Regions:
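Residues in flexible loops and secondary-structure boundaries
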Residues: 15, 29-31, 66
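Short, mixed-charge low-complexity intrinsically disordered segments
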Residues: 35-75
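A short, exposed loop/beta-hairpin motif centered on an aromatic-Gly-Thr core
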Residues: 15-24
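Short aromatic-glycine-(Arg/Gly/Cys) micro-motifs in beta-strand/loop hairpins
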Residues: 1-16
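A short, structured loop/turn motif at beta-sheet edges
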Residues: 1, 23-32
């Protein structure tokens, strides 16, 4: 089964957004994020959010791997 990663403090546009990704591991979660959001600033936001523990993990999720949902921040 996969895990659901809820990543906060990403996809900034004046204020932070968030992404919800279903993946088997945090490394795979990052790969999926990079496939969808490939701007350097978005990659840096993801890495910083992980470094600062700005994410939650729900284990044992019966959902296909990939982006579940996301929202950009906004002013």
């Amino acid at each position: 089964m996969n895990k659901l990663y809820i990543i906060e403090e990403v996809l900034y546009d004046y204020t932070p957004g968030m992404a919800v990704i279903c993946a088997s591991s945090l490394d795979r979660c990052r790969e999926i994020f990079l496939e969808e959001f490939d701007w350097d600033c978005e990659i840096e936001e993801f890495d910083e959010s992980i470094k600062q523990s700005m994410f939650k993990v729900i284990e044992g999720v019966n959902h296909a791997e990939g982006i579940v949902s996301y929202v950009y921040g906004g002013g």
